[in-house]
Amino acid sequence: MGKPSEQRQQEIVTSTIELCAEQGVNKITTQVIADRVGVAQATIFKHFKTRDKVFEAVLRWLSGGMFKAVEPMFKSKASADVRLQNVIRKQLGFASQHKALPRILFSDRLHSDSSVLKGIVQQVMARMTEAFTQLIRDGLESGTFASKQSPEDMAKLVVSTMQGTLMRWSIHDYSFDLQDEGPALYEYYMQALLASNPAAWTDGLIEDK
């Protein structure tokens, strides 16, 4: 008796994520996925009509997991600098546990082959930029930050440098500890935002007082 559809779909998604971390996106075919899952290729097509549909599910799963991890940090009642530090730590931590994330998010071939997949990535970036924009706006209004740049422009800077860090990690085959990049990113953001007396970087999440 076959496995329930939802369970099989999750196996396919999880296996695809593992394969992307190991081999990159370009080499992943439905047959490669089927071999990893241990099923016939026809079983993949039973649950996902095309390879792009598999990657669509993968992108939605990864982005959903990432936002689930960082959303409480964005919505915290802590000061803006503390919230930013916690978001950085959570983002880097999530990516460290899902090495395929940068290889999938930044795959030119994947995006050029499918406007749907490209649209999902654009939505992820827009949602993250919006969240950082609000955090920075809060920091400016509270006096924690003093940058004369608009919150929108500063949010784009934050998102872009985070993307660059993930890309560098992926290009170097995960040869350094991604979470060790947190303090330098945080210090850079604090300087760019002209933060006044920012909270020091800590070894763990800073809890709300």
Each model region followed by its residue ranges:
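Helix-turn-helix
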Residues: 11, 19-53, 57
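Amphipathic alpha-helical segments used for helix-helix packing
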Residues: 96-116
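Hydrophobic/aromatic-rich alpha-helical bundle segments in the mid-to-C-terminal region
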Residues: 140-187, 196-209
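Hydrophobic alpha-helical connector segments
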Residues: 57, 71-100, 151, 155-158, ...
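Secondary-structure edge/capping motif, primarily at the C-terminal ends of alpha-helices
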Residues: 73, 105, 109-112, 169, ...
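Amphipathic alpha-helical packing segments from all-alpha helical-bundle domains
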Residues: 64-67, 71, 115-142, 152-156, ...
